[in-house]
Curated annotation (Swiss-Prot):
Disulfide feature: none
Name of the coding gene: M2-1
Protein name in the entry: Protein M2-1
Organism annotation: Bovine respiratory syncytial virus (strain A51908)
Keyword terms, alphabetized: Host cytoplasm, Host nucleus, Metal-binding, Phosphoprotein, RNA-binding, Transcription, Transcription antitermination, Transcription regulation, Viral transcription, Virion, Zinc, Zinc-finger
One of the record's GO molecular function terms: RNA binding
Amino acid sequence: MSRRNPCKYEIRGHCLNGKKCHFSHNYFEWPPHALLVRQNFMLNKILKSMDRNNDTLSEISGAAELDRTEEYALGVIGVLESYLSSINNITKQSACVAMSKLLAEINNDDIKRLRNKEVPTSPKIRIYNTVISYIDSNKRNTKQTIHLLKRLPADVLKKTIKNTIDIHNEINGNNQGDINVDEQNE
């Protein structure tokens, strides 16, 4: 078997020369250095195509553009409620990204205050602890939290989303109530 040089176009992605190309396209014939260069190039290509700042959706697809996302039209809570009621064709990915953004908005201390008000045997304590753990995970690594949420079964994810929205509304309701009481005292 003759050992031909690896195709430089194949190393940098894909060779379009077809049968006219006289270089080797068989990876088993390539020297280790050429394989490493190809692997590094492909990994860099994947890394560049990922949008790490926004919502882990690809920039190439255009999904990261604000005016094209469901969140821009519906808001974070709207996306989650649409996913719960199965309207507006909200995907699990979009719901998980919106859930991650909602978790970033909620303050741990507010949930701990709500949890401390409950009776020690209350089933709500477990729900509060679950949401607190997701918030902590989200602060450490947003992408990993989104990945964990996506791996949940659909019914468990929906329960988690519903509980988180309820807690968010409860916190906002309490904060609004505190503001109204302060205004009345003045």
